Amino acid sequence: MFPIEFRFSGSELFEGGYDLEEGVRIAQTLESRIDLLHVSAGTYQRGFGDTHPSMFKDHGCNVYLAAEIKKHVSIPVATIGGLNDPAQMEEIIASGKADVVYMARALLADPFLPRKVMENRSEDIVHCLRCFTCMAERAATGTRRCTVNPLIGREMEGDEVQPALVKKKVLIAGGGPGGLYAAWTAARRGHSVVLCEKEVALGGILKS
């Protein structure tokens, strides 16, 4: 025996598609035949940005779909959609909006996110920017890349930073996320790093 999970959109979120009311009926029809409802949103043809919320949408913008469907069924309900804040995920479950919170892009950004939460190291989490670099790279090359995790797609090469054979003085121009990570990596390899930033604070666009 194994659990059966069904992923569907609580609403297709466009005129002519089915709405949340019909999403509830779909869930009720499936309820006796499956073990868990995985509630997403939108469609790939129309509403890709609803299925995969970008940085321009509120965190948890699709949770209401799972929350409403959960009121009408007796089996566990999962939610998904650009969630990357452990405190928000905990609130979703604790408040009964969903029984399970799924992550995808958040684990590309930081594969160790669940472990860090379990070890009370939330401040060490590298958060997904919801910038779609991973989606664009897959379309272009068939693999993945991530703005905040340069090791994604290079797992077979190993993720250990090796000491440089020749130590150099390295100049990094720009103290945004990429520059900071480059400086950190170069320093780990043993180089002498100088980081230059024209603004008064590090972080690039993130500091805003």
Describe each PLM feature range:
Residues M1-A173, P177-V193, K198-A201, L206:
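Flavin-dependent oxidoreductase catalytic cores
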